[in-house]
Curated annotation (Swiss-Prot):
Origin superkingdom: Bacteria
Name the record gives this protein: Bifunctional protein GlmU
Binding-site positions, UDP-N-acetyl-alpha-D-glucosamine: 9-12, 23, 76, 81-82, 146, 161, 176, 233, 338, 356, 371, 382
Pathway assignment: Nucleotide-sugar biosynthesis; UDP-N-acetyl-alpha-D-glucosamine biosynthesis; N-acetyl-alpha-D-glucosamine 1-phosphate from alpha-D-glucosamine 6-phosphate (route II): step 2/2; Nucleotide-sugar biosynthesis; UDP-N-acetyl-alpha-D-glucosamine biosynthesis; UDP-N-acetyl-alpha-D-glucosamine from N-acetyl-alpha-D-glucosamine 1-phosphate: step 1/1; Bacterial outer membrane biogenesis; LPS lipid A biosynthesis
Xref: CDD domains: GT2_GlmU_N_bac (cd02540), LbH_GlmU_C (cd03353)
Cofactor requirements of the protein: Mg(2+)
Keywords per UniProt: Acyltransferase, Cell shape, Cell wall biogenesis/degradation, Cytoplasm, Magnesium, Metal-binding, Multifunctional enzyme, Nucleotidyltransferase, Peptidoglycan synthesis, Repeat, Transferase
EC number: 2.7.7.23, 2.3.1.157
UniProt function note: Catalyzes the last two sequential reactions in the de novo biosynthetic pathway for UDP-N-acetylglucosamine (UDP-GlcNAc). The C-terminal domain catalyzes the transfer of acetyl group from acetyl coenzyme A to glucosamine-1-phosphate (GlcN-1-P) to produce N-acetylglucosamine-1-phosphate (GlcNAc-1-P), which is converted into UDP-GlcNAc by the transfer of uridine 5-monophosphate (from uridine 5-triphosphate), a reaction catalyzed by the N-terminal domain.
Main location: cytoplasm
Region (Pyrophosphorylase): 1-235
Amino acid sequence: MALSAAIVLAAGEGTRMRSNKPKVLHAFAGKTFLNRVMDSVAVLNPDTLAVVVHFQAERVAEAARSYDEQVTIVNQDDIPGTGRAVQCAMAQLTEAGKVDGPVLIAASDMPLLDSETLHRLVEFHTASGNGATVLTTILDDPTGYGRIIRDREGNVLRIVEQKDANRSELAVQEVNTSVYVFEASVLTEAIAGLKSNNAQGEFYLTDALETAKAAGKVGAFAAPDPLTVEGVNDRVQLAALSKTYNRRVCERWMRDGVTILDPETTWIEDDVQIGRDATILPGSFLQGHTVVGEDAIVGPYTTLIDTTVDEGAVVERSRVQESHIGARTNIGPWTYLRPGNEFGEDAKAGAFVEMKKAHIGNGTKVPHLSYVGDAQLGDHTNIGGGTITANYDGVHKNSTTIGSGCHVGAGNLFVAPVEVGNNVTTGAGSVVRHAVPSDTMVYSENTQHNVEGWKPAWER
């Protein structure tokens, strides 16, 4: 099964999204609509992958190139319609000598369009000897979709858009999904005769099927799962499709041995991995390339972004970005871990702790009310509440190193850059500005002054 070219239509604005950015750049389960469709199309390994752009063309083109540097960008002119988009694409590809064989055409507003459905569509097209094949589906409510009109023998006659359909045509439940396979020669001939004499005043690609009948057989392949070809036109549809899909994702993980107490409030993106016997509690969001190990507990009300949580760890009511949580380590509640943290095993970051680029050793605990940034903490060290590593001098971030076996008193301030050795004890309220050797106790001599008979200003 060789595809000469794949054309992804991404030129539209998507006005019903009411957005300042193109519809194709909205996110679904962690990826843009455009990238999700490009993902599925790329699996078929077409000789050429082209993306047609128009509205905010540079922005969409940049998104496409960030996915695939070799993608061919086609700029659609101001003549509207999907038919015109394909005319522009075929003209550019033909001039470059990049098209001779089956051509896949797909809209970019179907975030669940999958490679398996596309593979079966192309196989059906080739096996049937069709000049053109349209991917269809059956909907209980086909409102808004182009209807597939067949003859008495079941052959595809044409596709009628919603605004151009008569009463009997509107009753048809088989609809066009805006995904097609054409033989290049048939497509070239079919799009040459497109006209804009319709309610929208656009060049419809659907009209090309009628012309294609004269050049080759036209067929239809029904998508096995209607969800894979469901389009998104507004944010209401986006929310509904996201919820349906997320429920499927949660069910898949539950069948694979993961406990999810409330799938309705648990959101898991596609690239997340979860180990057996892990538990995900309500209100949790697992995003990006997050990995949750076996027997780990996440939640409730926790967000993990590109984070690895090893086996047996617990992350409760916290937000964690680009960090690694070691085995049996406890995070939370109300902990904020910014990017770059590395926790050993059996460690702890407790309530109202913020960390950034911190290396926390095995068994080391930062129980509460502390900021640890650009710091290395050894093994089995305890950090008292209210401790701050002052890492920023106004220009540069500086590092704090605290060794193993240390006991840091409450309310300590470490003015970086500073190094503290192993087995060091610091007194409460200490300000540590200079290096401290191992096996040392350090404290700041802050003199307490009592002013007797004092009255606050408002009582004087």
